[in-house]
Amino acid sequence: MTKPVTYNQHPEQQARDIIDKKLEQAGWTIQSVKHFNPNNSLGVAVREYPTDSGPVDYLLFVDGEPVAIIEAKEENFGHKLNTVEEQSARYADSKLKYIEQAEIAFLYESTGVVTRFTNRNDPAPRAREVFNFHRPETLQKWASEGKNTLRAKLKAIPALNPNHLSAAELGLRDCQLTAIENMQDSLAKDLPRALIQMATGAGKTYTAISIMYRLLKYTGKRRILFLVDTVNLGEQAEQEMLVFTPSDDNRKFTELYNAQVIKSPHIPKGVEVCICTIQRMYSLLKGEEMAIPDESVELEEWENRLKEPLPVAYQPDLPPEFFDFIFIDECHRSIYNLWRQVL
């Protein structure tokens, strides 16, 4: 068990205690070098593992193979964690003691409060902030992909309109064609967020489903969250998915991919598009059941009830990497204020 933080410790040791706790939450077994056994569980995190560049703060093993390193820093280092990325890379490229050298693809820098992550297999690797460390099975999957990462696949998605047809010939409106092409360009540039702004009645949901179809078709088996703020919006989205037929396939979207409105306290296996209210997602992240009437309450009324931001902790059954893409319908009502932490 991880020892509680004691505040007379050195600040970096305090950070390591928090990191230990977060690793354990994510399914890692913590070990010292003295008791090193990389086959003890699927995911093993070894403290102070020796390399020819000095001990690395944590070396992470998946199924007995080294896959990641963590460079730990004290909490007040959070705003300048990017300055230690070179140090992390040096440790990852160093010769490891006791075992044959392996290519370390995954790098973390963490204060325990702020954590940054780099996948060196990406086409243009760069660090990004993450909520927690990834689970062992996640790193195992990503390691098996090698250079064929999600971001590599996003860059390789073919053009929607290589023959420069009119939008009508593609079964789209001009604004829909522009939105889909711009979204694809944004994802290819590795921009993590994008905003689609369209007039009322312009077909935003149809546009979103068109983008989802292309993401699922060209990036493989993925999970998409379609987040709404009312039950009615979720049901409307489901109905549009039921009748949506892509221009390059005669089958309906829901014949190709499993899309469901989430109505239970868990997400069923095999669902590729999860349609969910932000209220239910909050209950899923809390690991709690919710009363159905609560889901029909408008966000504004929830905010009047709650008054302060909703706390969200790590949920092992629904880790941050569970979804590959998140679409937020009517996002101006949910991405700020009390619901921001849920996202």
Where are these regions (language model features)?
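Walker B catalytic acidic pair
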Residues: 277, 329-330
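Short, well-structured beta-strand/strand-turn elements
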Residues: 29-34, 249-259, 332
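Hydrophobic transmembrane alpha-helical segments of multi-pass transport and channel proteins
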Residues: 220, 330-334
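ATP-dependent helicase/translocase motor core
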Residues: 1-223, 228-248, 269-273, 279, ...
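Conserved helicase motor
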Residues: 231, 253-264, 278-283
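Post-DEXD/H (motif II) to motif III coupling segment of the RecA-like Helicase ATP-binding lobe
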Residues: 335-343
